[in-house]
From Swiss-Prot:
This is Envelope protein UL45 homolog. Residues 68-211 are virion surface. Keywords: Glycoprotein, Membrane, Signal-anchor, Transmembrane, Transmembrane helix, Viral envelope protein, Virion. Belongs to the herpesviridae HHV-1 UL45 family. The chain crosses the membrane at residues 47-67. Its main location: virion. The keyword Glycoprotein applies.
Length: 211
């Protein structure tokens, strides 16, 4: 067997050098890929965390809209010149008013005529401090009936036929807090609730408390 010639040794050195360069290039490529993979991985984790937080927040928001009773967030404070009674606020809007005038007076205050239960409770509260003479015009016109009104007496309120003109007492729900108003507006916007739901619900609660 022939021994390698000097030319063969030179060729071997060249080949080894090329192989070493190829190994260095491959290692450099691996390092470069590892360096570029970290930013992508961190970005993906950040996006995943943000999406998870968004889903959780959306779920909590929808749950509050469907299940939360915003009635517990009412401010409990009636506006100036209004009297609080149960879940309602009431105000004497005028005297000697016809039925149409009474409806218009309450509409101007974004309210409606007082209902029978609230009128009865209000009369029982004010009779000891005021006149019980019907000539003073303190016959209340009611929302529930166009022909029956309430007359305060010492023995308590009684139902009477409505004269042409009566006193006007308006009522509306107690105002909600800012948070409760936002929840209510969102429910109405999403058509999860009718606009008059709070008024009807507060009236039912007031009647239940006063019975």
């Amino acid at each position: 067997m022939m021994s390698p010639t000097p030319e063969d040794d030179r060729d071997l050195v060249v080949v080894r050098g090329r192989l070493r360069m190829m190994d260095n290039g491959a290692e450099h490529d691996r390092e470069r890929r590892s360096y570029t993979a970290w930013p992508h991985l961190c970005c993906g984790c950040t996006i995943g965390i943000i999406l998870t937080m968004f889903v959780i927040a959306t779920t909590l928001l929808l749950a509050s809209l469907f299940a939360f009773s915003y009635m517990s967030l009412e401010s409990g404070t009636c506006p100036k010149e209004w009297i609080g009674l149960g879940y309602s606020c009431m105000r004497v809007a005028g005297n000697n008013a016809t039925e149409l005038e009474a409806l218009d007076m309450c509409a101007q205050h974004n309210s409606k005529l007082i209902d029978f239960t609230n009128a009865k409770t209000l009369v029982e509260a004010i009779v000891p401090f005021g006149s019980t003479n019907a000539s003073f015009g303190n016959i209340f016109r009611l929302r529930d009936s166009r022909s029956t009104c309430i007359l305060p007496t010492i023995g308590g309120p009684i139902s009477v036929d409505c004269p042409r003109t009566c006193s006007v007492v308006c009522q509306r729900p107690r105002p909600l807090s800012t948070t409760a108003s936002i929840i209510r507006d969102a429910r109405i916007y999403l058509r999860l609730e009718r606009r008059d739901y709070y008024e009807v619900y507060s009236s039912i609660l007031s009647n239940a408390i006063m019975k």
